A protein has these predicted regions:
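N-terminal low-complexity, acidic/polar interaction/targeting segments
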Residues: 1-205
Length: 205
């Protein structure tokens, strides 16, 4: 049985899974391959303790090992929904993003355990409507992406569409991280402007 996600602010102790060139948003899913020993240990610990972990992007993607200062300060509380064995001890994971979380303190050791603060999304205000309208315009020109996002959506939360767009649109990992760190209103504003800019570029305007 899955433990419910805590409501409101609060702190948790979670194993930390560093991400390379990837970012995970709440209400979105992410598939990735884990093959480094510390990361495999994180998966093992998470599987024994509620299948929850903090998925957080590395600042330097080429770093072989990621310490506290090598990680961005904001990541996502995630649940492991699937673990599949691969060759040479690697694992393929499926993660579901639950809530944004701020990295407060990392406890040392080969496997990092972090104290994290769960973050509130806040009020998206009028920017949410503008972002959804921009997403509708973009998806009107990309029926395949619209079908994909329909399949991926697993929440009726107002920010679900915006977070799915942040997760799956063709932008860089750095841009995704900036969106993850932004407040709900700022994220809506940025993704709305970005979607319209992408559409204009594709049309050659």
């Amino acid at each position: 049985m899955t433990t419910p996600v805590p409501d409101g602010p609060g702190t948790l102790l979670l194993p930390v899974l560093p991400l390379r060139e990837l970012c995970l948003f709440p209400e979105a899913s992410l598939g990735l391959v884990v093959n480094r020993a510390p990361a495999l240990k994180v998966v093992e610990i998470a599987n024994r303790s509620g299948r929850r972990l903090l998925a957080v992007a590395q600042k330097e993607q080429a770093a072989a090992a990621a310490g506290h200062w090598d990680l961005h300060s904001v990541g996502t509380l995630a649940e492991i929904t699937e673990v599949a064995p691969l060759e040479e001890g690697a694992r393929r994971l499926e993660l579901d993003g639950l809530r944004r979380a701020r990295l407060l303190n990392v406890l040392g050791g080969d496997t990092q355990i972090a104290e994290v603060e769960l973050l509130e999304e806040g009020d998206s205000g009028d920017e949410w409507g503008a972002a959804v309208e921009a997403l509708a315009r973009y998806l009107h020109a990309h029926a395949d992406l619209r079908s994909f996002l329909d399949e991926q959506r697993r929440s009726k939360e107002p920010m679900a569409w915006v977070n799915l767009a942040c997760q799956h649109l063709p932008i860089t990992a750095t841009a995704r991280q900036r969106l993850l760190e932004a407040s709900a209103a700022e994220r809506c504003l940025k993704i709305g402007r970005g979607l319209d800019a992408l559409l204009r570029k594709e049309k050659g305007d």
